[in-house]
Amino acid sequence: MRTIKTRHFTGTTDNTVTKRELENRKVARRAAAEGMVLLKNEGILPLKEGTKIALYGVGASRTIKGGTGSGDVNERETVSIYQGMKNAGFEITTEDWIKDFDEKYQAARYAWRDEIENEAAKLEDQVSGFFNVYSTTPFRMPAGAPVTQTDAEVAIYILSRVAGEGADRFDEAGDYYLTEEEKKQLADICSMYEHVIVAVNTGGLADLSFMDEYVNIEALLQIVQPGMEAGNAFADIISGRVTPSGKMTDSWAVKYEDYPNSKTFSHNNGNVDKEYYTEGLYVGYRYFDSFDVPVRYGFGYGLSYTTFETKVLSTVLKDNKIVVETETINTGDTYSGKEVVQLYATCPEGKLEKEYRRLVAFDKTGLLAPGQSEKMTLEIALDKLTSYSEAEAAWVLEKGSYVIWTGNSLESSSPCAVLALDADVVLTKTQNICPLKEELEEMKQSSEKITQKLAALLKFTEEKALPVMELKAADVETRVVEYHSNAECVPAEAREFVDTLSTEKLVALASGDPGKGQGSNLGSAGISVPGSAGETNDCALEDGIPGIVLSDGPAGLRLMKHYNVYEGKIVNKPFKFSLEGGLFCEGEPADPGETRYQYCTAIPVGTLLAQTWDTALIEEIGEMIGGEMEEFSTTLWLAPGMNIHRNPLCGRNFEYYSEDPLVAGKIAAAMTNGVQKVPGCGTTIKHFACNNQEDNRMGSDSIVSERTLREIYLKGFEIAITESQPMSIMTSYNLINGVHAANCEDTCTKAARCEWGFQGMIMTDWTTTEQGEDCTASGCMRAGNDLVMPGAFSDRDNLNQELVDGTLSMDDLKACISRLVNIVWQSNQFENAVPYKKVK
């Protein structure tokens, strides 16, 4: 018996800080500190308590907590670096500079707001039109006052940048490069102060050539965008209260031009309609490592205040898995710390060209005191060593020697064992998907160079007498994927129920309810959560199917900080009031009725979370988010975002985890496992797939080979699904080889459901089907994309028309609604819900 919960208004009527807020801030602070990466330290850090500090940079008092757009969070307050350093007992000698900058900042913010309001007022659509103006008009920080010399012992400079949804960054001053004002500030700081520390507070990578100019920059930290506890977490690292343990999840090139797609990415070549993935597999470290291009800071790199030594105790082949047992000891004498053990593999060259090394496993120790050690067991499943053969339509292991490396970064890793395979073997037989419709010439290595590098590597393994594990192809079982149509991938009980619903209700359920969340009467509508992204239709409420609420992420729940209830209804507020912490509603008259407060936790952005390399911590954060979802009646969190960092100028990289699919998949799985510990709550992994460009994101076509698509851009989603079974997937706006991702049966049904065993629901990104006739609601249903969001009457018209003319089958529509119903039944809108992962 399923009992729908009694409905209620979310939030509290008391504006006092709650126990939940205080406890969750602690988790956010811990995560922020653990994800910050110490890139350089010439003995200056940590600083002693009470050290006099000259603090400069726009991020000093206006620290960027996160990106803009759907990834923003309306928290109660954010702790700036200035506040955090004062809280930690440091003396700030540049109070006047900071006060002057704050005044300039406020004036610039209001001018920016007015510019957006004025431009948006000219447009007919005041919702999507406003957001388009907002997302393509980035806020530019004002310049601070001239630097002056104080009696500080150390100067700290905070380099900050804002990025967000809807627009890519530029390789120009004020974005990837320093402005002339910033160069002058940094030059003055380095001339006036003997000891200088720089922190990079940006959503993506930035040019660091200034590090080559100033020898007295003695420490460099990558703090990304650390969430609401930014300042306290920064002070924890600077003071030594927390020892840095973050590691890079990207490769920081010496110069932007070193990235293989730097000339053609997004607007760089003037073409935002088609994005040719000519670098193929060679994304991030796979390129730099394979082509021997030096980097400034490499993948997996990060310093500590202490030192570690990791020994490989054993490497064995067990049940067709490589099992590596390691022991890590803190060899320092002062600071406790954590270390990340990373395993890489070099795969043999056969018919398929391969990257020189790929990440295949990682784990992080607990906090180790000086002299303390910890043993860990890492496993490498055979699928982590496979490559995709388009010719065979299969994941294959090619004959030869697979060299396993261990280290605490890619650069520091060294060979530790070899797996010898006696013959080629197919691990998984699939069908081809997403075929190219035009020629694509991918980057290739010199075959002679490959042969030389591999020969030298194998010679080294023989000279060192590294252990060799023998694997016979005959002992490897081949899995042959069974493919089913969209209409066949259906939960039986839900399908029986759906057969009882009218066509009118089926069509209504196929898209979100456009009226929810604004002025809804709780007596006649579903639960409405102001600031949430949307709600599914509750047209079948009398049949036992309530609407469920979906809230944006991925840096926490994005809701309105407060709203009013008047005469039993939520007072309607424009969408823009949920942006920028309420900047666009300042000066508006007070609303009538009772005020309710819903403060959510702003956790660090995705990149910083991934830089922790700590799946246990990420799972803890996920469970924390799930608790807030329950408190605010949210079933689906529209997160985590897990697209690949293909180029550092992608405007949305801050939301995403890494240039590496294993990191992206593992972190997303951990976040999902945490959220879904909370009964009836689930994640929505996104954006599926190849959403690596924000300019023209609604119409950009990603031209990519099937092998690259599978090994780089789909692999993270595959890992997340097989290791955590998220409730939902969100498709992306872009096309993949000429087919809109939202209308792509190859990815939605063949890959996600048939190959990876996805059991949940798939939804579109917002307004995907409202951009033209080549992406339709009916196309979504045929592809196995179950829910069109946020919902428009034009979607219903399209579905009804195609049901009548037979273009859309009733079986396809019912299959999609069955999967939606199956998720709603397991949601927190029912009494006695259980964690989703426990539902068979």
Report each predicted region and the residues it spans.
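Glycoside hydrolase catalytic-domain context in secreted enzymes
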Residues: M1-S387, V396-S412, T430-K840
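Extracellular/periplasmic metallocenter environments
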Residues: A393
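Short beta-strand elements
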Residues: S412-K429
